[in-house]
Amino acid sequence: MGTHASPNVLLVVLDSVRAANCSLYDAARETTPYLSRLADESTVYTQARAPSNWSLPSHVSLFTGLDAHVHQVTVHDRLRAGHTVFEALAADGYATGLFSENGFLTGRDAGLADPFETVVGVPDDYDDRYDTTVLDPGPDGFYYADRVLAWSAEVDGPWAACLNLMDAHRPFEPREAYDRWGDDRARTIQADLPIRWEWAFYGGDRPYWQLGALESLYDGGIRQADAVLEHVLESLRSRGALDETLVVVCGDHGDGFGEPGRVPGEPPAVSHILPMHEELLHVPLVVRPPGGATGERVDELAALTRFPAVARAHARGDPPSRGFTVDRALALKQPVTADLRERFERRCDPVEPYLEPSRAVYENAPDTSGAVRKHSYWGDTGVTTLVHAPGVVEHREPIEPETVDRAFRDGNDRDGGDDRDPVREPLAGRQPDADVEAQLAALGYY
């Protein structure tokens, strides 16, 4: 199994989905029944880590295989051509497609859409059956699922696609069939909040307990994303294409609902972009190779940055023995700059705890079965923790931030250092499209 030459490649990104809230990883709510069934014919990674705590840097890392501190792409930059796995696959004869509501992928001039021949973002008009939200002006994930299915059915030859599903991204508006844990109070709390709600909590306007109500809606969003995934994969199965496809399902980052910091001075986790908690970095990762697998669960450390190497190896018909496992994984929080920094300065007093730099290094813990070590810092304070499972974290000992920074320097040198071809280029004053910015604002990015 898994040795087909030139299989299709399907990367399904469950945007904002954290491992701790997936029933696949023993979450109390049955949020991922299909993913749990898919696990029986796949490889499940129990200790997978995202390279950053929000979509833009994580997707650049997913597409290029470069850690976030290496590519350094922020909202002020764009990814230069020639660095992604999808361009490499296109050169090998693959048709390529990108399907997502996330404007950082399909709308904004970030360079992430450029590698793809077909790009489907938020449409001007769409069928009412996809119009299931009030706060979010775009269609739900079933729209993008149907677009990737229609596109792949017309491709003559191998194809490679990224389907990014935003059903579990704020605002949380799952269809009634999947909204199993939310209630009127939760929906009212969300409706009364600004869509970018970090400052309502960090600034003291709202109590942190209200985030628990939002989490009940978030879990419904995960359940809906799971149903969209089922629709896509079972449709491929019914047409005989699933066994000809490498399927990689992952979260690009998680989300925060008031979890306390584990480093002294670290604020509670609220949403994403700022927090570096495990709830933001520990993500689901399920890989179904062509022909299926045997339901193996891998407890070693795994990194999303392995996707390009894994995809290219499968395309050659030579799957890598290590899969997504790594000896070390790196994750970072990008600097809080420009408008985002100004908003924190206006709403938070003191503001300094929210602006601190943060990095994390993960390593396997061979002396503790199934666990990984996390060395991280927030500002000038660092700690080592032992992560046994999603949401199960044991504090170990304080460390110096330099211990973490040294690992990042080693990683940069390993990836070519200053001699490496530039991956990014500045936007240099180019103004974003107003419609794209409005759509991103509706998703809580501004």
Locate each region found by the language model.
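Catalytic domains that recognize anionic headgroups
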Residues: M1-Y446
